[in-house]
Amino acid sequence: MAYQTAVAVPRSGNVWIDGLTDGYRWGTSAENPAIGYTFIGHTRDLPGGEFGGYPSLGWSEQERQLLLDAMQGIADVSGLRFIDRGDNNDDNVELWFYTLDRRDADGSYGFAYTPGSDSDEGLVAINRSMYQTSDFKPKHSIAPGSFYGITFLHELCHAVGLKHPHDSGLKQQPRFPGLTKRSNQYRDSGMFNQNAHPFTQLTYVDKGARNGYVPTFAADHGFLQTLGALDIAALQWLYGINPNASSGRDVYRLPLSNTEGTGWRAIWDTGGIDRIDGSLAEMPVTIDLRNATLGQDDAAGGYPSSAEGVFGGFTIAHDWNGVDLTESAGLCIIEHATGGRAGDRLIGNQASNRLRGRRGDDVLYGGLGGKDRLIGGPGRDQFWVEAESGSFAIVRGLQPGLGQVGFWVTR
């Protein structure tokens, strides 16, 4: 396979996608979708202590796995594929992975060069000294979902064509709405508060988000484990969608404690009858089955589903074909939601949903499309049905004299 050169990317016209794309991508195609990668081992015994102009400290199994998982995460949602060219290789390689110390990384957590930037395009460097001492003892967790763990996916995304929401990029791409070159890049979440976890991991607004979804310190949990819904849309604009991801009957279980590795995931699921499950929760849960809108609104990057007090859960990516943002592709749909043992809030979508509240004083919203089943349980449940022509919902488990049925309008 020949080296994939960088090609220019047209703007999508969507403020979030254009706010994350740097202007170029690798020149892959449906017939030739892959780029090659190599891990650079320890360079101490090489001439000048460098490989390709940079030193490297080698890779632990955990570090290597974080980048392998990051590549798989991109392949799961997009048409881009990755081929292992073997370690310390410079033949037909687009992505070069290095680990550096604080001095060589110039104090940053890591850095990467986007396609089309310069001769170092595709280089990804991780600053190991941010999370490990010089005698190889851990300083901070790099588990997925941790403050430092997201660095690996973040830098890889740069190397395939994504930028920060607060930057203008190689081709003067727009920033996210509400951001300027004078914005505080660590605190300003912009208009609609989308420049933050859990909506994009390309942001610098992580522990500074103060949005209730993530911790306010560099914790070992609570941040994105995967691509955010906005990242997914941007990658799909660059490389197309993966129409075959998670096509079976999948259950997405809400995390129920703030332990190491708890975090946020954006769901891209293209088939089967699927469910977000909070059935083991003792605390109230919110489960919202609606997709990220990608519109200029607070739900552009998704509607978070989580257990109360837990920094982690799910959003659901925008349902589209990677070309036309205005049409639902009928692919990324989660049909069912199950609550727990407290007062839960379950919200359906345009599909035929089964919303099961179980115990507690639950509030269930249905009737947005399809043939919904709203199932209560012991408690003072509320059942709200969309008051539009064609709405349909079956209500079960209404406790006489306790529960109530109402109608709501979404537009």
Annotate each language-model stretch with its function.
Residues 1-59, 69, 106:
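Disordered inhibitory propeptide/activation segment of secreted metzincin zinc metalloprotease zymogens
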Residues 48-89, 153, 271, 277-282:
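Zn2+-dependent metallopeptidase catalytic core
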Residues 292, 296-364, 368-369:
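Extracellular repeat-rich scaffold modules on cell surfaces
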Residues 34-36, 40, 44-45, 187-190, ...:
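GD-rich hexapeptide-repeat beta-solenoids
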Residues 99-125, 188, 195:
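Catalytic zinc-binding patch centered on the HExxH motif and its immediate surroundings
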Residues 55, 137-152, 170-188, 194, ...:
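Acidic, glycine-rich calcium-binding repeat modules characteristic of RTX/beta-roll
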Residues 77-79, 156-173:
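Catalytic Zn2+-binding segment of zinc metalloproteases
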Residues 38-42, 113-143, 201, 311, ...:
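Active-site scaffold of zinc-dependent metalloenzymes
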